[in-house]
Amino acid sequence: MVANYASMMYHNGSNILGYGVLRLLQYNEQLMSGWESTMKDDIGYWRRFVHDFYTEKGTFRYNIDYKDSPNQEPKLFELSYAALPRFLYLSYCGKLKKMSFLLGNTKEFAIPNNGYFVESSRASILYQYQGGVQVIVSGHLRAHFFRAPLLKLDSLEFSAVGHSEYLLRELMTNASLALSQSRPPQNQIQHDGVKSEDPSSESVNINSSSSLLPDSPVNEYGLEPHIMRFMEITETISGMRDLIAFTLAQRSGPTSALHKFATALQQQHQMQKSTSSNIPYANPAPSGFNGSPRNGDVASLASNYRYAKQPPTMPANAISQANRLLDQNNIPNMDPSILPQSMPIASVPPYSLQGIKRQGTHSPMVEGENPNNNPNFYSSDMLNAQKRTKV
């Protein structure tokens, strides 16, 4: 098999395709051998296994979404690098004899940094249990390998869409034979020449045949109950990772750390909210604007542009105050074309320009002058109140 895959390799840029599939086959081979007596109860073996095939940030995601069973809600489990050895150890501590991946329609892609992405759209996980029970979970597999320096799994994801449970033919034959030998003579009652079977005998036969077959080791999701429980607990602990790290850093009790953690989250949320509120917007709408400036303030230029069809009315004292602030004799660069015709010039709020010369810019009123050559182009009395200028 290795030779066949080696012959399929070809050079594509800086990466040679085929290494990702080979590494996945090595992973599958060592995963199947976990039931051996020397490794079954050794969690150290699984720690070495995870260290050899996963990066320190590697994860295993198991998604369950049965389209044919709408009553079963979708589930998503994510196992981190630290939880993977315990997961594999518990899997083989039960009735499981062998666990392996079956790949179908496998594709491999080279990614930057000498990595590989392997995808199998018709993949399956094969579980073989003691007693002759076999469970096949079908789904979709995605594997992302990262070279560090050997190829290791940065993420392994399996999306289950259904499962099937199988029994050995030998078990079915033995159960049928035992049932036929233990069956009492047919309890038939004859009434007027018509034979009728006892209805209770059919239910007894069904119960007897079910008792002779081994029990199902998996639940409705195709997982063993204790493995399902472990994955649920791990998912909960993974969501509390920040709280656990905060508790260890504070060296306080659970209750005190929980209150401090909630306070820290609130402060962080308030800081983010205040930071986002200080970001200027291009055309903000004034709060409480109903057609006139609030509290007699001078309307902003952005508000005038936004409500140009209905220019705001201004009190007389505001207009006189604006007239005192704006001395039109000191604004030679004023271009009234940028203002709405229906809005008085006095309603434009003052703003000041920074005393920085604009390189290569000419005044629209004096075309021939260059501000770099004329030191009096921006006089000190012109920097108090300026109008917007078209350039």
UniProtKB/Swiss-Prot annotation:
InterPro entries: LIM-bd/SEUSS. Residues 180-190, 370-383 have a biased composition (Polar residues). Residues 180-217, 366-391 are annotated as: Disordered. It is found in: Nucleus. Keywords: Cell adhesion, Nucleus, Transcription, Transcription regulation. GO terms for cellular component: cytoplasm; nucleus; transcription regulator complex. GO terms for biological process: cell adhesion; negative regulation of transcription by RNA polymerase II; positive regulation of transcription by RNA polymerase II. GO terms for molecular function: transcription coregulator activity. Residues 201-211 have a biased composition (Low complexity). It comes from the Eukaryota. Belongs to the adn1/SEU family. Probable transcriptional regulator involved in cell adhesion. This is Adhesion defective protein 1.
